Amino acid sequence: LTLDEKVIQPKELQVNLVICKKDLQDSWEAEAMGFSAFDNLAPSFEEYVIGYTAAKVANKIETNIWEGAVGNAGEFDGFGVLSTAQLPGANIMAAVAGGVNDGNVLAEMGKVADAVPTTVYGQEDLFIYVSSNVARAYVRALGGFAANGLGANGIDGQGTTWYTNGSLSFDGIPVVVGKGMANNKMYAAQKSNLFFGTGLLNSTNEVKVLDMSDLDGSRNVRVIMRFTGGCQIGT
């Protein structure tokens, strides 16, 4: 048994935005008056701005986790860059010409599943992570209509209506959609080998809001957020 060590080096990141109140106030007022379909309403304009900014940052972090590159401003190396640099070439498959679609998705996912070592297959934390377009193609392929050997009406005879945002699996391996993944990408990995690190976890949801009206008379709001983030792959 050989043990190795890898280190996560989180990158310092920050958000420094200037937002005009007018750009957000209409939607905030509608929410505060109860026109929103959501039950949890922002009790103050400041909390609305914090929620708005945090949601945007969360989307960017999700993309960074999969596709980020440390050389780009506001990014750290994601699993795509790390896997290319660290994994043996035999473990990396070329993307299918023309991209993944409902006609080839079963074969392409089969290649990924077949590459999983027998010692790893069946582990409870093994997943196939796929991009949104791959998941969409897989759902459509399982809808059938005489395609892909699934008969005229696919799973349970429901056609393309069979899927209602439930769980997916392939060859007994759970399938997870990585919202930040680029099109046509798939990874087979144990969740316990995929790491995201940050200095303090609550740093990723702490936002400072400065109302500039008392300082310069403008209708601007300055939003400041500082945090660290980085990824690493265990083997």
Q: Where do the model's predicted regions map?
A:
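Helix N-cap / beta->alpha transition motif
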Residues: C20-Q25, V130-V134, Q190, T235
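Ordered core of a single globular domain
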Residues: A107-F145, G149, G154
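Assembly/oligomerization interface modules of large self-assembling protein complexes
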Residues: L1-E31, I50
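Alpha-helical scaffold segments that mediate packing/assembly in large oligomeric complexes
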Residues: A30-D114
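Sequence/fold signature of self-assembling virion shell proteins
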Residues: D77-A107, V139-T235
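Short helix/loop capping segments that flank catalytic or ligand/cofactor-binding pockets
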Residues: S27-W28, I61-E62, A137-V139
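Extracellular structured ligand-interaction cores
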Residues: E12-Q14, Q123-D125, G172, N220
